[in-house]
A protein has these predicted regions:
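A beta-strand edge to alpha-helix "cap/lid" segment located at domain peripheries
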Residues: 3-10, 95-184
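A solvent-exposed, acidic/Ser-Thr-rich amphipathic alpha-helical stretch
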Residues: 46-121
Length: 184
């Protein structure tokens, strides 16, 4: 094998490894955002929020854009603002309580350019509330990632609503109040 071939293969491998790392970090974010939180041993939202923040760069941006999400989510710049965003979502729960939501990602596109990357997904998410009300939400994600000290992190989460549709009340008859899937 020539040095040129080895260099080309190395470059291709680096892109593939970067895509895999980005895919894992985006999936971990969605996993941590599920309710109930499936991460074993995470019993409170403050701990969950810190695990989510570990996925972000210090200067990251989290924003909801478009006519539906502008007013609902707005823009949070930096980890402290992102922490406040998640505290408003999980820490200030109102009645009815959110009992179940699960994030499903599809239509993935990841574009790596050295130590930066962008990824786009479509996301579907069923919600079930304690009063029986249920909905299905879909949004598009256009996220940015940056390699920091050899580790890929999220530098921007940008989400735009595709639709919100009601589901039949109590659409899920059986669901866990907590997750034990990852219990050792």
């Amino acid at each position: 094998m020539t040095d040129t071939t080895i260099a080309q293969l190395t470059a291709r491998l680096e892109v593939l490894e970067s895509e895999a790392d980005i895919r894992r970090i985006q999936a971990r974010y969605m996993f941590l955002c599920d309710t109930p939180c499936p991460e074993f041993g995470v019993d409170d939202d403050a701990r969950r929020i810190e695990l989510v923040l570990d996925l972000y760069t210090e200067d990251a941006v989290w924003e909801g854009v478009g006519e539906y999400y502008d007013g609902q989510f707005g823009r949070a710049e930096g980890k402290d603002a992102i922490r406040a965003h998640f505290n408003r979502f999980w820490g200030e729960k109102t009645d009815p309580a959110l009992l179940l939501n699960a994030h499903y990602l599809t239509s993935e596109q990841i574009h790596v350019d050295g130590d930066t990357a962008e990824g786009q997904w479509i996301h579907m998410q069923p919600w079930l509330f304690s009063d029986g009300r249920s909905l299905l939400r879909s949004s598009r994600l256009n996220n940015a990632f940056r390699k920091v000290e050899g580790r890929w992190l999220i530098s921007r989460t940008r989400t735009e609503n595709v639709f919100v549709a009601p589901l039949p009340n109590h659409f899920a008859e059986a669901f866990p109040s907590s997750s034990v899937l990852l219990k050792p």
